[in-house]
Amino acid sequence: MKNRILVVDDEEGIRLLYKEELEEEGYEVALASSGEAALERLDESNIDLVLLDIKMPGIDGVEVLRRIKERWKTLPVVLCTAYPHYKQEFGTWASEAYIVKSSDLRELKEKIREILNR
């Protein structure tokens, strides 16, 4: 059975890039364009890992992370953001990993593999 990854990002180009790259790695990928949509998707689906942007309109990624950890305590979350300074923010510490967005997705793919193989 394929692992299911939920990609949460307000930028469509990022969502589609991650979807294509992760499907090539053999994962099943679901998409959400907002924090609200991500929480709805988690209610409806079995997800094995969440890739979560931090800076989004509406509910930001740090708040989504907090809500995920309240309801789905063991669900791994990888924060993916273009802003490296968020790593120092206390609210991000609950994530399994913190990745700065890059066009090179090797680090992200390696981290996903590592987390899902625990």
Predicted feature descriptions by range:
Residues 2, 46-48, 72-76:
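His-Asp phosphorelay/catalytic-motif detector in bacterial-type signaling
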Residues 16-24:
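Charged docking surfaces used in two-component/phosphorelay signaling
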Residues 31-40, 61:
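Helix N-cap/capping motif at the beta->alpha junctions
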Residues 40, 62-73:
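Short amphipathic alpha-helix used as the core "switch/output" element in two-component signaling
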Residues 53:
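Active-site residues of response regulator receiver
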Residues 56:
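Receiver (REC) domain active-site loop signature in two-component systems and cognate sites
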Residues 63, 83-101, 106-110:
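Alpha4 helix (beta4-alpha4-beta5 surface) of REC/receiver domains from two-component response regulators
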